[in-house]
Design a protein with these regions (language model features):
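Short, basic/glycine-rich phosphate-binding loops at helix/coil junctions
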Residues: 9-14, 59, 63, 192-203
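Short, compositionally biased "basic patch" segments
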Residues: 1-10, 49-57
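Short acidic active-site motifs
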Residues: 29-33, 78-82, 125, 218-219
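Internal, active-site/partner-interface "lid" segment
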Residues: 131, 145, 172-204
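Bateman/CBS regulatory modules and CBS-like beta-alpha motifs in cytosolic regions of diverse proteins
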Residues: 192-225
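An N-terminal, well-structured beta->alpha segment
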Residues: 3-39
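Glycine-rich phosphate-binding loops that contact phosphosugars or nucleotide phosphates
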Residues: 42-171
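Terminal peptide-recognition signature
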Residues: 15, 48, 93, 166, ...
C-alpha cells in the first residue's frame, strides 16, 4: 500500500532538489540580465506558453509590485496580434522548458528584427531559444516530481524560483524599500499600517460621542454600538 505521506514528502524533496541544483547555474548571464532590466528605458515583457505562461504571469505580478514595470504576453496570443504590446525599448524575458515550441520559433525572429534584447529562462540550453537569446538563464531539471515524469512540476518550481531570484536582486539593486512596497499595496496590511489613519477607518456618523457627564453605562453602550 502506498504511503501517501512519504509520497508527498518525496515530491517536495524532488522540487527542493531542483531549486538547489540550479544554484550552480547562476553565472554572468544572470548578472548581465538584472543590469539590462534595471537600465532599460522600457518595460519587461514576460512571455511563455502552457505552464510556463502561468509562471510568467506570477513573475509579472512580483516584478510590478517591487518596482520593475512588467507586462505579460501569452506566446500563443502574441503570434496572432498581441505582438503590438512590445515597444522598441522593452526587454523580453521568455520562459520555456523545451525552448523549441513552435510559438517560440515564430516569436524570436520578431524580437531580433525589432532589436529587443531577449533573456531566455529555459530548461534546455541546447534549444533554439537558448541559442538565439542574448542571455541564458539555465533552469533545467533532471526529472519532474510527477510520477510519470511528464507534468511540469520540478521544472515550473525551478522557473518560479529563478524568476524570484531576478526580482529579489532587482529589489536590492533599485534600493526598493518597505515604504515603496506599501505604496503599491494600499489594500494590504503593510500599506494600511504605513498610510491609513484612524480617521480613514470609520464613517463620521458612526463615531462614538458622549458628553463629559454621560453615565458610564451609557458610555459603554455608545462605544459598543459604534465599533
Amino acid at each position: 500500500m502506498t504511503n501517501w505521506i512519504e509520497r508527498a514528502q518525496d515530491v517536495l524533496q524532488q522540487e527542493a532538489d531542483a531549486i538547489i541544483r540550479i544554484k550552480a547555474f547562476i553565472n554572468e548571464d544572470f548578472v548581465k540580465s538584472i543590469y539590462l532590466i534595471k537600465e532599460s528605458q522600457g518595460r519587461l515583457v514576460v512571455t511563455g506558453i502552457g505552464k510556463s505562461a502561468i509562471i510568467a504571469q506570477k513573475l509579472v505580478a512580483t516584478f510590478n509590485s517591487t518596482g520593475t514595470p512588467a507586462i505579460f504576453m501569452h506566446a500563443a496570443d502574441a503570434i496572432h496580434g498581441d505582438l503590438g504590446i512590445i515597444q522598441p525599448e522593452d526587454v523580453v524575458l521568455c520562459l520555456s522548458k523545451s525552448g523549441n515550441t513552435p510559438e517560440i520559433s515564430v516569436l524570436v525572429p520578431f524580437f531580433k528584427m525589432r532589436g529587443n534584447k531577449l533573456i531566455a529562462l529555459v530548461g534546455n540550453t541546447d534549444s533554439y531559444l537558448a541559442k538565439e537569446a542574448d542571455f541564458v538563464l539555465d533552469c533545467s531539471v533532471e526529472h519532474e516530481a510527477c510520477p510519470n515524469n511528464l507534468a511540469p512540476t520540478s521544472s515550473s518550481t525551478a522557473q518560479l524560483a529563478l524568476g524570484d531570484a531576478l526580482a529579489s536582486c532587482l529589489i536590492e539593486m533599485r534600493g526598493f524599500t518597505s515604504q515603496d512596497f506599501a505604496r503599491y499595496h494600499p489594500g494590504g496590511i503593510l500599506g494600511k499600517r504605513l498610510y491609513v489613519k484612524v480617521k480613514d477607518l470609520y464613517k463620521f456618523n458612526e463615531r462614538p460621542e458622549v458628553a463629559p457627564d454621560t453615565p458610564m453605562d451609557s458610555v459603554i453602550l455608545e462605544i459598543s454600538g459604534k465599533r
